[in-house]
Design a protein with these regions (language model features):
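Conserved active-site helix of classical SDR/Rossmann-fold NAD(P)-dependent CH-OH oxidoreductases
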Residues: 13-20, 24, 54-57, 86, ...
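Active-site beta-alpha turn of Rossmann-fold NAD(P)-dependent dehydrogenases/reductases
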Residues: 5, 34-36, 104
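Conserved sequence/active-site signature of Rossmann-fold short-chain dehydrogenase/reductase
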Residues: 31, 38-40, 84
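Short-chain dehydrogenase/reductase
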Residues: 4-16, 47-54, 77-78, 108
């Protein structure tokens, strides 16, 4: 993580360094959790990485296919919000301090695979469209190794991506009014 070339990564390293410095200077106990690409009910539309699922589902809701920026080979580690909650509990119960853990599944999912999965789950027959991706894209591949979290705080992600996406789609379908309000609020910003 220390060979990044963007401000996003630099801020993450800075935050971790500050927490470590506080621990060693003032005795502040902490555990840092590095969440991979979190998804789930009530998902935020503003996040640079997490919004990809919601944007694809919005396109499908409009009767369009998902749009991928780039060739679809960019890959991420999608982890459910329920698994993130479990990681928080594991970290609070653990004896660990002054440590950082990846919260993810360790599973690599390309944007093309994600789009295909969403098309299958929604029974949408529209094709995926591809557009040029900006070279300013912050991260092109982000898959976390979950082994340290498993070994030291007892956390293992439990939710399969396909199952989690099914739950997310059901939530969207059950609460269309709230979804519309979130979309409108995001558009106003």
């Amino acid at each position: 993580p220390f060979n990044n070339k963007n401000f996003y990564g630099a801020t993450k390293i800075c935050g971790e360094s500050m927490a470590t410095a506080f621990h060693h200077r003032y005795g502040l106990d902490f555990v840092g959790l590095r969440y991979m690409n979190v998804y789930g009910a009530r998902q935020d539309y503003q996040g640079a990485y997490i919004a990809v699922i919601m944007k694809m589902l919005d396109a499908i809701d409009r009767g369009e296919g998902p749009t991928i920026l780039g060739d679809g080979s960019e890959a991420f580690d999608f982890v459910s919000v329920e698994d993130c909650a479990l990681a928080n509990i594991c970290a609070m119960k653990a004896k660990a301090t002054d440590e950082f853990y990846n919260v993810g599944t360790g599973t690599r999912t390309t944007l093309k695979e994600l789009a295909e999965m969403l098309l299958e789950l929604t029974e949408c027959t529209q094709p995926i469209s591809y557009r040029d991706r900006s070279e300013a894209t912050l991260v092109k591949n982000r898959i976390g190794c979950p082994e340290k979290a498993k070994r030291e705080i007892g956390f293992t992600a439990k939710e399969d991506l396909k199952f989690g996406l099914t739950k997310l789609i059901e939530w969207r379908n059950d609460d269309k009014d709230a979804l519309l309000r979130r979309q409108q609020k995001a558009a106003e910003r």
